[in-house]
Regions:
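N-terminal and secondary-structure boundary signal
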Residues: 1-197
Length: 197
């Protein structure tokens, strides 16, 4: 297997080159123009963040990517799937309101915002794969139906996986609620009776 190229840029800016410009150059250098973008539905898989925290990519980066994709004739949209846990992202109405609170809306993002697995997390496609642990993951319909999926991901520490990034964004983040249930099914509570009162 050939080693993947990893592109890097620093955070230095100048009056003629800001961070958005640098991101666009990185995306172009990585070969975005070689994708069959014309008339394609392009899902930009992103995490909209929980209201009140800052652990998400800012909407202006998503807007820059959406505009670049549109310049190649694509039909981009931002997407994420509902969460398994109760909270502000467990259904599409609250999820979209949370996204708007963090600045993700069709005006700021320069493209539509679609919750991938629908109103209650039940809109999905089963994708047959030959996986060891999963044979037919349940992927949010908007992601499964897209012609192209681009992961726009921040890197973070994760309590179970050690770290989260593109693989978690696509793997867990693309799963519809029933798919998330299956992914977490191997995690059973363990009771240590000797520690019980």
């Amino acid at each position: 297997m050939e080693k993947a190229k990893v592109y890097f840029t620093d955070l230095r800016t100048s009056p003629t080159s800001n961070l958005l410009d640098k991101m666009e150059r990185l995306v172009k250098k990585a070969g975005i123009a070689q994708l069959p973008l014309k008339d394609s539905f392009v899902a930009i898989k992103i995490h909209f963040g929980e209201p009140g925290n800052l652990a998400y990519i800012r909407p202006n980066y998503a807007a820059r990517l959406a505009n670049l994709l549109r310049s190649y004739g694509a039909k981009p949209f931002l997407t994420d799937s509902n969460t398994l846990y109760s909270g502000r992202r467990s259904n599409a109405v609250d999820h979209l309101e949370s996204a708007m609170e963090n600045g993700f809306n069709p005006i700021s993002a320069q493209c539509q915002v679609i919750i991938a697995d629908g109103l209650k997390g039940t809109e999905y496609r089963e994708i047959p794969i030959d996986g060891q642990y999963c044979k037919a993951p349940k992927i949010g319909a908007a992601i499964a139906d897209a012609n192209i999926v681009i992961s726009m991901t921040h890197f973070k520490g994760h309590e179970q996986a050690g770290f989260g990034g593109a693989l978690k964004n696509l793997g867990m983040g693309s799963a519809a609620v029933p798919g998330k249930l299956e992914l977490h099914a191997s995690e059973q509570p363990k009771i240590e009776t000797e520690n019980c009162i």
